[in-house]
Amino acid sequence: MFKKRGRQTVLIAAVLAFFTASSPLLARTQGEPTQVQQKLAALEKQSGGRLGVALINTADRSQILYRGDERFAMCSTSKTMVAAAVLKQSETQHDILQQKMVIKKADLTNWNPVTEKYVDKEMTLAELSAATLQYSDNTAMNKLLEHLGGTSNVTAFARSIGDTTFRLDRKEPELNTAIPGDERDTTCPLAMAKSLHKLTLGDALAGAQRAQLVEWLKGNTTGGQSIRAGLPEGWVVGDKTGAGDYGTTNDIAVIWPEDRAPLILVTYFTQPQQDAKGRKDILAAAAKIVTEGL
């Protein structure tokens, strides 16, 4: 049973009310679309945008996919890979998370909820990573990129864990342009789901580093209206959101349901109009559809 969550539950219910069995669907590469995929197709049609979803059920490695192999702009969901790359360094450079970087006024970007308090002061890489993942602080992200030696090294880290799809080309806030057809700073839902699984539940990071990444994700402050809003109360979630032009609205999550194996869920959404507003409600509705369909 899904417990009510006030206005957010009403909003999700309103979105789901638009479902129609006759909605055109994007079939999986083999076989007929499932009922869950049909519901996702109806949600997408109602939204007027393009929706990408990938869910991995770790109990049996089964997947639910919708446009799982299509590219979407990652926006700030890419920050997960950046922080993971820093954590990877800490496996061999044991004190690196305590390394400090100076925050200068010139470093500040369009979103600096944490770093703006540290102008002309120092922050450790651990503090920058937490700010990046839990508050989506763009300056913190850029400082981590500076430490890592640029975006190409983040892409190289993704390749090292077997992700051949992820590509990070620009820093914040330029990476959020999300121009249709532009492959810069993009990935596919399934590729991101597999990488998130490796990083949070697999062996891409050593135990202590994996636990730290999960702790940061669980402490995220920006995801309350996205995937989390579509799940039953009592389920534990660690996630990273993202947003950009064309109403691009993203969330990637590792989920611990009550009394069952963890889930990995990636939801990407974008729209045709550059000035379109974000639609966190679409992500919440998609999360409800796929988890009810398990």
Curated annotation (Swiss-Prot):
Pfam families in UniProt: Beta-lactamase2
Signal peptide coordinates: 1-27
Domain of life: Bacteria
Enzyme's top EC category: hydrolase
Active site positions: 76, 174
Record-linked InterPro entries: Beta-lactam/transpept-like, Beta-lactam_cat, Beta-lactam_class-A, Beta-lactam_class-A_AS
Keywords, sorted A to Z: Antibiotic resistance, Hydrolase, Signal
EC number: 3.5.2.6
Binding site for substrate: 240-242
Reaction(s) catalysed (UniProt annotation): a beta-lactam + H2O = a substituted beta-amino acid
Gene Ontology biological process terms from the UniProt entry: beta-lactam antibiotic catabolic process; response to antibiotic
Further comment: The class A beta-lactamase family has a specific amino-acid numbering system, sometimes called Ambler or ABL numbering and often misspelt as Amber. A multiple sequence alignment was used to derive a consensus sequence and then the consensus was numbered taking into account insertions and deletions. This allows use of identical numbers, e.g. for active site residues, despite differences in protein length. UniProt always uses natural numbering of residues, hence there appear to be differences in numbering between this entry and some papers.
PANTHER family: BETA-LACTAMASE (PTHR35333), BETA-LACTAMASE-TYPE TRANSPEPTIDASE FOLD CONTAINING PROTEIN (PTHR35333:SF3)
Similarity comment text for this entry: Belongs to the class-A beta-lactamase family.
The protein's name: Beta-lactamase
